[in-house]
Amino acid sequence: MDVASLISPSESDTVPTFRSRSIQNSSASHYKRLSEQSTGSYFSAVPTHTTSYSRTPQPPLSPPAEDQSKCSLPSISILLENADGAAAHAAKRQRNSLSTHRDSDPRPPYDSITPHAMPPTPPLRPGSGFHSNGHSPSTSSVSAASSSALMKNTESYPQAPIGLPSPTDRSSISSQGSVQHAASAPYASPAPSVSSFSSPIEPSTPSTAAYYQRNPAPNTFQNPSPFPQTSTASLPSPGHQQMISPVTPAWQHHHYFPPSSSTSYQQNHDRYICRTCHKAFSRPSSLRIHSHSHTGEKPFRCTHAGCGKAFSVRSNMKRHERGCHTGRPVATAMVQ
């Protein structure tokens, strides 16, 4: 009995197991149903939320206006920046084109200009420059030639003002170097010729002073004057000449002063002034002879018999004796 009961289970034992399984199945189905209901309620609730979200942008009309206002302001600034960028790009492109043009074309115009800058050398030869009226024609020709070379350079390159200083400096330096070499070559050996030119060089010092004022750049070339080094060393400077010139009697001679430059030497040389007409003279004898024209005095008188002519200047009396009286010379009598 006990063994049979152990081998074949009773109904009381089998029923609880079936019930426990049914309970488990029912609980699983219930959980599944709850999960389906919960998911169905979630997915059913989501479309209502999406529809309500899709309806929210429609009622307010102000956000598009704000967006348009926000977009309109940057568009103006962007346009301004684009305009500035376009202008800068155009300027940069023009600068690049000018640089390429300057890199491609500079040789032929400069080669054609350099022969035109060379002709200032012929006026500086002894036959034309130094034996003419002072040295002002040579300096004026040099300045005129350099100015013409500058004008030619500016005319050949009107579009590139930035690149002009270097070729003009080169042309001016080359022309001045050739002028200095041509001027120093014929006057290097004869030293006495410097002393022969010492007296007529004095009137030309205003032109050299003006030449220094026109070219105030000592760094480009060391000796801007076309004179040789020996003659410039013997000549005093214009500022120092005012102190030396009254002492040197050779330069005070009135024959070496042209009429155009007599006014510039009035303070230094013309120290003797007439009290009647305020005319200045460089020597007291000249002032005394001039004073005879105001007083009417004629101290020099011809001593030939039967003549008796009086003269205010002794040279006039000598001329009268040579022209009218061809006899023996007679001692001059001066009336006190």
Curated annotation (Swiss-Prot):
Any single Gene Ontology cellular-component annotation: nucleus
Low complexity bias: start-end ranges: 136-149, 182-210
GO molecular function: zinc ion binding
Record note on disruption phenotype: Leads to a reduction of protease activity and a decreased virulence in a G.mellonella infection model.
Zn finger spans (C2H2-type): 272-294, 300-325
Bias-annotated ranges (Polar residues): 7-29, 36-56, 168-181, 216-245
Keyword terms, alphabetized: Metal-binding, Nucleus, Repeat, Transcription, Transcription regulation, Virulence, Zinc, Zinc-finger
InterPro entries reported in the protein's UniProt record: Zinc_finger, Znf_C2H2_sf, Znf_C2H2_type
GO BP terms: regulation of gene expression
Keyword Zinc attached: yes
Region of interest (Disordered), residue spans: 1-245
Pfam hit, one: zf-C2H2
Cited PROSITE patterns: ZINC_FINGER_C2H2_1 (PS00028), ZINC_FINGER_C2H2_2 (PS50157)
Localization per Swiss-Prot or TrEMBL: Nucleus
Task of the protein: Transcription factor that controls morphogenesis and virulence. Acts as a positive regulator of gliotixin and protease production.
Protein's name according to its UniProt entry: C2H2 finger domain transcription factor mtfA
